[in-house]
Amino acid sequence: ISLVFFVLLTTNAKGQTADSIISNMDDIEVSLLTCGPGNEVYSLFGHTAIRVCQPSRGMDIVVNYGMFSFKQKYFIPRFVLGLTDYQMGITTFDDFKAEYEYEQRWVFEQTLNLTSKEKSALLQAIDRNYKPENVTYRYNFFYNNCTTKARDLIAANIDGKIKYNSATSEYPSFRELCHSKTSSHRWSQFGNDLLLGIQADLPTNISEQQFLPENLEHDFSLATIETNTDEANNTTIGANNASPRKLVSHEEYIIPKY
């Protein structure tokens, strides 16, 4: 199955082809969705996903790197110890929103300020990642989770690089960051500490702190895109010939905090 096939199955995108979906980027919006924490051990840190919306063609989907199955043997212990396989999944935005409304968890949307070329590259990357041979990955709380996967996918398909402008003099350890979210879940704390080992009390940099969804949300709000420059020809690479530009063009709660 591919992204295009999923869109054709779940929307009113009649008459569309793969080429038409990938090539018509002008009115497509790509957003980062940050979700509040839940009550289960696997949702204590919150969640991150990517929304791709094109109302004119009836497309509104969510790309989600947080899919898993409870059928995995010893799921909770494996999750706590970072030994769980996760999958990338795609769902409709309406279904995604309904789930978080039911669980009474807030969702914050940040619309990304991307060029048509960047949006096209991102959708093609999503399509590749959605192939059966690429869809599964080994989840890790700190270095390979739903938030870092979304961040890295976006960063890899930007015509330049993301500059994080978050000014901070605080560099908490992984242990401190985790315990701020797991104070009432001792087994989760134990598993996190065991997984980190000697790294647990080392100070973290901005990139490492972004394993927490709310930290990435904050950093995206202040981030800019530094456009690539061809120094030999003294030309700017990118459709808008503008550098820097804000990474986020608009942000709002689509489900408010309860």
Predicted regions and their residues:
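Soluble extramembrane regions of membrane proteins in the secretory/endomembrane system
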Residues: Q16-Y258
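Bacterial Sec-dependent N-terminal signal peptides
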Residues: I1-D19
